[in-house]
Amino acid sequence: MINYKEQIAKQIGSLVEMPDNEIEKFIEIPNNTENGDYAFPCFKLSKTLKKSPQIIAQELKEKIQIDTEIFNKIEVVGGYVNFFINTNSLTKQVLQEIDQKREKYGAEEQKNKNIIVEYSSPNIAKEFHIGHLRTTVIGSAFYKVYKFLGYNTIGINHLGDYGTQFGKMIEGYKRWGTEYNLEENPIEELTKIYIRINDLCKKDENVLELCRENFKKLEDGDTYCVELWNKFKDLSLKEFYKTYDLLGVKFDSLTGEAFYQDKTQEVIDILEKNGKLVESQGAKIVDLEDKGMPPCIICKSNGSSIYATRDLAAILYRARTYDFDKCIYVVAYEQNLHFKQIFEVAKYLDLDKKYTDGLKHVAYGMTRVPSGRMSTREGNVVKVNDLLNEAIQRVLEIINEKNPDMEDKEENAKKIGIGAVIFNNLCSTLIKDQIFDWNTVLNFNGETGPYIQYIYVRTKSVLEKAGYIPEFSHIDISKLQDKESQKIIKILYQFNNILNQVIEKNETSFLARFLIELAQSYSNFYNENKILGEDKEIQDARIYLTYAVGNVLKIGAGLLGIEMPNKM
Ligand code: ARG
């Protein structure tokens, strides 16, 4: 498709002393379409050219040679040169591309670039909390978008399956394991054991020492300890997969922290060799004072590795195994400092700059229920599976009330309920904290997942009523010149660009907003225009546009992890 900004930059670039890509950055999209589709502001040129922006704009306008296939006209308003695109040719390009690429519209060719997306990463034997839900759906969306854009993408669930707490879990299980029903409610029961042993440790120093020994044994591969640890892990994963299956989330690798346990020595050796390790109260640390950060502990005084060391080992391993161009970590902003530290220390691991430059923490904000924050330690825990099932249940109630005879009720309720929760996690700027409120999340008329699904279903029912989708080659493009159709075409045109912004800015909300805008525009189009029963040529063109909108809504929602119901 024509890249309009590039075209404008090329024209202007041949007339002024400024590189095309610089010019491209200045090109704006006017809020008011009366000022054209693109506008080039001349203020920046005013200084070097020693002329007023208005005069420069006027001169540019006179010199620019417009290709009428691309632009209908150019106008000067104030210090701007405004470009009006040839809407017929735009419409044709967009719909033709959709016709050719179908469910691949917006996708790109396979690239020779490896992207790691690390997401979810819950902790074994602990509750999968609402923060984990967020990383899971955000990470999964990035994973899908990267893949769609042709990147070789690797999704990693960096399980929190290691740490001194397992020494405690083992001790607790050894003492009271038979009292708890682990098969039924593994995480809840394991948490109870953990709390109980923790209390005991606080009272009895000897028990704490036993726990420490267990952990050491675990590190050294003791059969009993490893067996128990495996049991905790398997039980936990079975629980986690209930959530993943509901969400439709997948991973390419489940290599968690434990996997790196025997790989931390190399990290220590390299840092030692590079003279970066300093002794501090028996521990080994990397001083980061000159970077304005507290030191990064690499090795505790008892010799065991910590969370950060395993992350550093993971960076080495991932660089070698996947030769990544980018490795993004979708983790809550509470860990900002951790990632700043390990990314800094990673620079001392003799890695190619390509790798250290490719590390990126994509931080996201917390989810609050109206009554406060949701976390494991505080009482106010909301279990993710319960939340997802409640979403489905609530939708089912709405359906039973409004459309009790609907076919595939359960299946649709699941898609709508889950889709609503997913969308809610992706639609606002990721770094912002968010409030989880059922009334907002499930509002079918709001800026929500269900709204997008609702409009999608509407496009489906229009096509069903029509009974046919005309062939693109038979469409008279000039029948789509009305305001509402043109608005839709311009949005559709942006789709690939939006996907690229998602990965450049690490923001899923761009895609979420895009889908809302597309859905709203179709709704306007639908309200303002008769689709069926019009003159045949108009009808065909509008049916085709309807098909195009449905197609892109489905692709885009799919990339966010949202499935489309067949009825609503
Ligand atoms: N397991 C950690 C938690 O639940 C998150 C792990 C994040 N990823 C990492 N590479 N450190 O808080």
Protein language model regions, located:
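Non-catalytic interaction-recognition regions
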Residues: 1-92, 102, 109-568
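Beta-lactamase-like hydrolase cores
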Residues: 95-96
